[in-house]
Amino acid sequence: MGRGRVELKRVENKINRQVTFAKRRNGLLKKAYELSVLCDAEVALIVFSNRGKLYEFCSTSSMLKTLERYQKCNYGAPEGNVTSKEALVLELSSQQEYLKLKARYESLQRSQRNLMGEDLGPLSSKDLETLERQLDSSLKQIRSTRTQFMLDQLGDLQRKEHLLCEANRALRQRMEGYQINSLQLNLSAEDMGYGRHHQGHTHGDELFQVQPIECEPTLQIGYHQGDPGSVVTAGPSMNNYMGGWLP
């Protein structure tokens, strides 16, 4: 009984996906080798993993020569105004630039994974020390940047505090000025009221001042002969003294 048809789709489990990739990659490299040996074919195989790691196989001594042959067959002969030698030099230069960029890309990918704590197994002790120094330098730079940011924020807050203190001082001076003016107005009003009250008392004292009574130096006591019930009034004549008491 044969195997059933396997549905081709992405393996969701990360571990299973890595295992499947390793098995299929090894099988693919083996098939390429067998094809080159059995059929005397020129085979070049390039595989990049999902993490950017390169796997390659070439049946000849140089991958670059196989790629040059591929470009010649795929893109055709160069233009008429360009000689074959110049075209070859241009292709070689392009291939070298491509290889440099590829190596740079792979190096950056490895560095990124190492900084994230991945793929540390192949690293030597010296590489790990170098990575540790890089991380320490990065941490120092991050802390320095954070400290400078906090100092800038502190400076801004201090400037705002100074402006608020100046505004508060100006408001306090204005309030003190208002209080002094209000106190002066109250004192002026009290002085005016006291002056009117004192003037009224003085005028009342003048109204109710006791006038001196003029009196004669002599006093007569008795009755007139004509009117026994009437009191004898005082007069200037000495002959009238006590006239009512005489027979």
UniProtKB/Swiss-Prot annotation:
Reported tissue expression: Expressed abundantly in the seed coat and to lesser extent in young buds, carpels, petals, and stamen.
Keywords: DNA-binding, Nucleus, Transcription, Transcription regulation
Annotated compartments: Nucleus
Stored SUPFAM superfamilies: SRF-like (SSF55455)
InterPro entries: MADS-box/MEF2_TF, MEF2-like_N, TF_Kbox, TF_MADSbox, TF_MADSbox_sf
Name used for this protein in its record: MADS-box transcription factor 1
All copies of domain MADS-box, residue ranges: 1-61
Function: Probable transcription factor.
Gene name per UniProt: MTF1
Primary location group: nucleus
One matching Pfam family: K-box
Residue ranges occupied by any K-box domain in the UniProt entry: 91-181
GO biological process: positive regulation of transcription by RNA polymerase II; regulation of DNA-templated transcription; tissue development
GO cellular component: nucleus
PROSITE patterns found in the cross-reference section: K_BOX, MADS_BOX_2
The keyword NAD is assigned to this record: no
MF-aspect GO terms: DNA-binding transcription factor activity; protein dimerization activity; RNA polymerase II transcription regulatory region sequence-specific DNA binding
